[in-house]
Swiss-Prot record:
It comes from Escherichia fergusonii (strain ATCC 35469 / DSM 13698 / CCUG 18766 / IAM 14443 / JCM 21226 / LMG 7866 / NBRC 102419 / NCTC 12128 / CDC 0568-73). This is UPF0266 membrane protein YobD. The keyword Amino-acid biosynthesis does not apply. Keywords: Cell inner membrane, Cell membrane, Membrane, Transmembrane, Transmembrane helix. The keyword Cell membrane applies.
Length: 152
């Protein structure tokens, strides 16, 4: 096994661990889920570049008669990238004492101020940073508001 194959296996394992944590473990942490809201995706150009570069590497490996295991590992990495960037839906998960946003736990007590912008972006001011929450469905903002009012 070459160093290239070892690095590919490590990247695949890391992406697989992230996908399992995001889909199965995170919703079960810190109590029952009160509300899970799908969010808008960020720009997909990075994901297109990532998957495109992997496809170029697969093509290069096949045309140069490279190791077959490397081709399979690159294909698995491309599939994991496709899942992470295009199939998985980013979401904000509200719990009793806080919420998960971008896979980070934030307690309600850390929220100093909340504003709603004209284009439907919920802005939460924390101690040292702002969270810009872009929901997929504008009606979900009312659900978030009702939940935050009832838990505070």
């Amino acid at each position: 096994m070459t160093i290239t194959e070892l690095v590919l296996i490590l990247f695949i394992a890391a992406l697989l661990a992230f996908a399992i944590y995001d889909q199965f473990i995170m919703p079960r942490r810190n109590g029952p889920t009160l509300l899970a809201i799908p969010l808008l995706r960020r720009g997909r150009i990075d994901s297109v570049i990532f998957v495109g570069l992997i496809v170029i590497l697969i093509y290069n490996n096949v045309t140069n008669h490279g190791a077959q295991i490397t081709t399979w590992l690159l294909s698995a990495l491309a599939l994991m990238g496709f899942y992470i960037f295009w199939i998985r839906v980013p979401k904000i998960i509200f719990k009793q004492k806080g919420f998960f946003f971008a896979n980070v736990w934030i307690e309600y007590s850390r929220i100093k101020a909340m504003n709603l912008s004209e284009d439907g972006v919920l802005v939460m001011q924390l101690e040292q940073r702002r969270l810009l929450i872009r929901v997929r469905n504008i009606d979900d903002l009312e659900k978030i508001y009702k939940l935050l009012v009832s838990t505070q």
